[in-house]
UniProtKB/Swiss-Prot annotation:
Similarity-based family: Belongs to the KdsB family.
EC number of the protein: 2.7.7.38
Name of this protein: 3-deoxy-manno-octulosonate cytidylyltransferase
Reaction catalysed by this enzyme: 3-deoxy-alpha-D-manno-oct-2-ulosonate + CTP = CMP-3-deoxy-beta-D-manno-octulosonate + diphosphate
Source organism of this protein record: Burkholderia thailandensis (strain ATCC 700388 / DSM 13276 / CCUG 48851 / CIP 106301 / E264)
């Protein structure tokens, strides 16, 4: 795949996962997970693919497979902070588009990565672009692990929340608080996809921004940018992405998929 515009893909990878230790180095069909993610980023047409990690073992693994790697500090509170360090170290120009490809998503669609980068380029007033897809069932809308996003008329985010937004009052109120009895939403509801493209000038600013109260309450780092006045363009795609790897069960599922592909 050839991207219509240059962008840099950065894959943050940390070993200290509480639910799945050493996750970036987990074997998927003979290669570490982080390498599989980097391969997907390369397929997306990134001008440069970098893995950012505080672990030398991760850097060594990706370099063995021909990818560039950057050693970062171990105390970053988020992947965005890790990207900010990379942008500063490598001196990216203000307009460089940097895509954060999560290190635990080896099945991510390369076309989506490319499209989110292009979406940011098409929205010069926005510092960030991300993606979302429609959801239609009440159990999805009311699931706090599904982050919802409300958009304005131009497809720019108004708010992200774990709560059921927008709230279909006439549909939901008669059944409240019996979530199991809730009908389908009566207006479009979008689930956020955790893929981000940033302008490098914003990444340099991000570590200086104070944490926002809404960010702390929702535990959603993108709300810090919005709290401080930045705009986030949202690309709506019709299809849900492949799930990432958070637990041993997730890892076993994806390992089985890679084994089946090898047959």
């Amino acid at each position: 795949m050839t991207s219509p515009l240059p962008f840099v893909a950065v894959v943050p990878a940390r070993l200290a996962s509480t639910r799945l230790p050493n996750k970036p180095l987990a074997d998927l069909g003979g290669k570490p997970m982080v390498v599989r993610v980097a391969e997907r980023a390369r397929e997306a047409g990134a001008q440069q693919v970098l893995v950012a990690s505080d672990a030398q073992s991760v850097l060594d693994a990706v370099r063995e497979h021909g990818f560039d790697a950057v050693l970062t500090r171990a105390d970053h509170p988020s992947g965005t902070d890790r990207l900010a360090e990379v942008a500063a170290k490598l001196g990216f120009s203000d307009d460089t588009i940097v895509v954060n490809v999560q290190g635990d998503e080896p099945l991510i669609d390369p076309q989506l990565v490319c499209d989110v980068a292009s979406h940011l380029a098409a929205h010069p007033s926005c510092a960030i672009a991300t993606a979302a897809h429609p959801i239609h069932e009440a159990h999805e809308v009311f699931n706090p692990n599904y982050v919802k996003v409300v958009l304005d008329a131009n497809g720019v985010a108004l708010y992200f929340s774990r709560a059921p937004i927008p709230w279909s009052r006439d549909a939901y109120l008669p059944h409240w608080p019996n979530i199991a009895a809730m009908p389908a939403p009566t207006c479009p509801v979008y689930r956020h996809i955790g893929l981000y493209a940033y302008r490098a000038r914003f990444l340099r600013t991000y570590p200086t921004l104070a944490q926002a109260p809404i960010e702390a309450a929702e535990q959603l780092e993108q709300l810090r940018a919005m709290w401080h006045g930045e705009r986030i363009a949202v690309l709506v795609t019709e299809h849900a992405p492949e799930a990432g790897i958070d637990t041993p069960a997730d890892l076993e599922r994806v390992q089985a998929l890679f084994r089946s592909r090898a047959k």
